[in-house]
C-alpha cells in the first residue's frame, strides 16, 4: 500500500493520490468500525492488530522514505498530490506505538510542501493535543484534518469535538467530513468549519445499506 491509490477522493484532478500509514492497527470506537476493511486486510496478511491492548505494526524505513519521493515528483510536475494518512490506522489514536510513529510523521509533513496531507480520524477530540504546538498558531497549508461521521449521532459528536469545542481566536482551520460508510441520515445544515464532504457506502459481502439523508 502507498503508491498510487484507487481511492477516488485522494486524486487531485488527473494527479493520482497516495496512502501513507504510520502503523497498521487500531481500536474500534463507533459503528463505522464494525466492518473495518483495514482489519480484514491485515488479517488476510496474517496480522492481528486490532483492539485497545493490541500490537501495532511498525513499518520499514523504506516505507517512511516514500513521501519524500512523492513530494519530489509532485514538485517536478508542478502540481500537488494528496496523501491519505492513515488508511490502515488512526493517526490520532492514543496508543504508545502510534504516538512514537506520529512523532516521526510531523517533520515529514513539514518537509513535503507539495503533498496535501489528508489526516482522517474518528478521534477529532485528540487532534489539538497531538499535533505540534506551532500548528495551533499557524496551521500548515498542506494539512487538511478530517473526521468520519456515519450517522447523525456521530456527526454531532465529532463535529462538536473538531469544530466547535476547539475553535479559538488563535487558529481556525478547515475540516473535511467522510460520510462513509453512510449508515444513517445526517442533517448537514450546521456544517460550520467544514470545507469538503466525502460520501460513500460499504462494499463487499455483508455490506450494510447506504442510508443517505
What is each PLM-predicted segment?
Residues 1-82, 90:
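N-terminal [4Fe-4S]-dependent radical SAM core
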Residues 63-213:
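Conserved AdoMet/S-adenosylmethionine-binding subsite of the radical SAM
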Amino acid at each position: 500500500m502507498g503508491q498510487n491509490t484507487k481511492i477516488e477522493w485522494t486524486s487531485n484532478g488527473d494527479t493520482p493520490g497516495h496512502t501513507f500509514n504510520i502503523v497498521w492497527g487500531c481500536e474500534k470506537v463507533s459503528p463505522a468500525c464494525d466492518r473495518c476493511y483495514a482489519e480484514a486486510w491485515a488479517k488476510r496478511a496474517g496480522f492481528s492488530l486490532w483492539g485497545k491492548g493490541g500490537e501495532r505494526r511498525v513499518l520499514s524505513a523504506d516505507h517512511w522514505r516514500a513521501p519524500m519521493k512523492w513530494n519530489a515528483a509532485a514538485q517536478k510536475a508542478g502540481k500537488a498530490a494528496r496523501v491519505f494518512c492513515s488508511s490502515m490506522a488512526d493517526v490520532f489514536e492514543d496508543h504508545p506505538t502510534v504516538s512514537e510513529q506520529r512523532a516521526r510523521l510531523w517533520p515529514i509533513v513539514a518537509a513535503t510542501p507539495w503533498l496535501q496531507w489528508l489526516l482522517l480520524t474518528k478521534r477529532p477530540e485528540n487532534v489539538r493535543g497531538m499535533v505540534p504546538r506551532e500548528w495551533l498558531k499557524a496551521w500548515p497549508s498542506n494539512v487538511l484534518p478530517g473526521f468520519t461521521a456515519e450517522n447523525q449521532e456521530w456527526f454531532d459528536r465529532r463535529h462538536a469535538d473538531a469544530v466547535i469545542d476547539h475553535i479559538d481566536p488563535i487558529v481556525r482551520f478547515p475540516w473535511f467530513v467522510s460520510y462513509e460508510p453512510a449508515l444513517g441520515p445526517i442533517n448537514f445544515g450546521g456544517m460550520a468549519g467544514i470545507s469538503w464532504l466525502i460520501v460513500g457506502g460499504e462494499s463487499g459481502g455483508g455490506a450494510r445499506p447506504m442510508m443517505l439523508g
